[in-house]
Amino acid sequence: MLMTMRKHGITLAVFAALATGLTALVNGLTTSTIERQAARQQMQLLDQVVPPDLYNNQLLDECYLVTDPALGSDAPHRLYLARKDGTPVAAAIETTAPDGYAGAIDLLVGADFSGNVLGARVTSHHETPGLGDKIELRLSDWITHFSGKSLRSDNDMSWAVKKEGGMFDQFTGATITPRAVMNAVKRTAGYLKKNLNALEKMPHCGDSSHE
């Protein structure tokens, strides 16, 4: 009887060890798959605001944490530095429009260091369906009109909605939302124009002391 109990105990221990190992393996594979999918989705978004033919480095490996009032909040924002043969040529940077109609609007903006906007996309918002939500690419191409626009100075009067004498369309029944997004893109382009030399001194994404 004692021998039988020992055999059962050993068998159970072996099965438990195998089950634990299999669970760890599955979890590891699942985590790796999720991380790859997240990286792929992030690159797809980055490609929309910084054309891939402009750079030849790995954007996800050149991620810095930037904190500045021009980016709309006190929270650190991720900045991805694009290089061509080692020379910085542009950046994609998270930014916030704090003054949306229904709260903060989060964006990703791509621009070079001369004030030229390469692209912009809204990543999160709470604007009114049917009105302010036209900032989403899936509902309107309005957000694409920032591509190719240039910021000559902080006081560039063309950076306004058309009803205020500027070059950007407002939405029917909704001016606050497009104005907020436009001003956020403007501030972000201005930030990149002024801060090229400071970017590489910023902490890297993943630095535990800044998370």
UniProtKB/Swiss-Prot annotation:
Subunit structure comment from the entry: The complex is composed of six subunits: RnfA, RnfB, RnfC, RnfD, RnfE and RnfG.
Bilayer topology annotation: Single-pass membrane protein
Cofactor needs: FMN
Enzyme Commission code(s) on record: 7.-.-.-
Keyword terms: Cell inner membrane, Cell membrane, Electron transport, Flavoprotein, FMN, Membrane, Phosphoprotein, Translocase, Transmembrane, Transmembrane helix, Transport
Molecular function GO terms recorded: electron transfer activity; FMN binding
Annotated compartments: Cell inner membrane
This protein's name: Ion-translocating oxidoreductase complex subunit G
InterPro entries: FMN-bd (IPR007329), Ion_transpt_RnfG/RsxG (IPR010209)
Keyword match Transmembrane: yes
Gene Ontology terms: cellular component: plasma membrane
Lineage summary: Bacteria, Pseudomonadati, Pseudomonadota, Gammaproteobacteria, Enterobacterales
Residue stretches spanning the membrane: 9-29
Chain positions with FMN phosphoryl threonine modification: T175
Family designation: Belongs to the RnfG family.
Pfam families: FMN_bind (PF04205)
A biological-process GO annotation: electron transport chain
Function: Part of a membrane-bound complex that couples electron transfer with translocation of ions across the membrane.
Keyword Lyase belongs to the record: no
